[in-house]
């Protein structure tokens, strides 16, 4: 199985800029990518596509400055192909095993906000259209092409890290992940007084 992981290295996760510095966001993005790679390694040949040079041990990195849709559609005819987003740190081998075992010409794993977090295409001819409710667009596209589409439903694949509420999910469910350990290291924790909420400890300079 070919596995494509798109990755944005420059100014990643801008919606977290109110609680993370640019350097912290870059490191979080890098570690989430490594978490995804760790989960996906047993299932096939991984290729990371990025608009700039990137050093990731053990996987092929391709530099492509095109937009996401153009980048992914360039390789869609290499089906069977899986496209997995790089900001899904809660993924595990168990979750991906179930994903890859799901029958269908097209398997779509939705995000919590209507996006497509993972996509598995087993037939040539399919084209992606990310952003703006892509989950529904991909299901409709498969239907129009006469392809059998299946929805893969998993909490752990639905959590893509974009804002503070997503970080809360990572801190509650991501123990053992590289990204989780990084957030703990820079002072993040979860308060369980009444409604769970994200907290950050401030380290005083000596």
Swiss-Prot record:
It is an enzyme of class 2 (transferase). Its EC number is 2.7.7.68. The keyword GTP-binding applies. GO terms for molecular function: GTP binding; phospholactate guanylyltransferase activity. It catalyses: (2S)-2-phospholactate + GTP + H(+) = (2S)-lactyl-2-diphospho-5'-guanosine + diphosphate. It comes from the Archaea. The keyword Transferase applies. Keywords: GTP-binding, Nucleotide-binding, Nucleotidyltransferase, Transferase. Pathway: Cofactor biosynthesis; coenzyme F420 biosynthesis. GO terms for biological process: F420-0 metabolic process. Pfam families: CofC. Belongs to the CofC family. PANTHER family: 2-PHOSPHO-L-LACTATE GUANYLYLTRANSFERASE (PTHR40392:SF1). Guanylyltransferase that catalyzes the activation of (2S)-2-phospholactate (2-PL) as (2S)-lactyl-2-diphospho-5'-guanosine, via the condensation of 2-PL with GTP. It is involved in the biosynthesis of coenzyme F420, a hydride carrier cofactor. Homodimer. This is 2-phospho-L-lactate guanylyltransferase. The gene is cofC.
């Amino acid at each position: 199985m070919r596995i494509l992981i798109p990755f944005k290295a420059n100014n990643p996760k801008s919606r977290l800029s109110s609680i993370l510095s640019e350097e912290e966001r870059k490191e979080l993005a890098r570690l989430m990518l490594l978490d995804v790679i760790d989960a996906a390694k047993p299932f096939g040949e991984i290729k990371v596509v990025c608009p700039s040079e990137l050093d990731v041990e053990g996987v092929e990195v391709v530099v492509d400055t095109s937009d996401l849709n153009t980048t992914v559609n360039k390789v869609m005819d290499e089906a069977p192909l899986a496209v997995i987003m790089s900001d899904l740190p809660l993924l595990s081998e168990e979750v991906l095993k179930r994903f890859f075992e799901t029958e269908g010409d097209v398997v779509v794993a939705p995000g919590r906000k209507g996006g497509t977090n993972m996509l598995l295409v087993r037939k040539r001819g399919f084209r992606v259209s990310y952003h703006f409710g892509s989950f529904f667009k991909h299901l409709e596209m498969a239907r129009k092409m006469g392809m059998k589409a299946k929805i893969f439903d998993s909490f752990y694949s639905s959590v893509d890290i974009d804002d503070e509420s997503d970080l809360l999910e990572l801190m509650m469910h991501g123990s053992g992940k590289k990204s989780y350990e990084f957030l703990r290291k820079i002072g993040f924790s979860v308060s369980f007084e009444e409604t769970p909420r994200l907290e950050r400890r401030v380290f005083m300079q000596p």
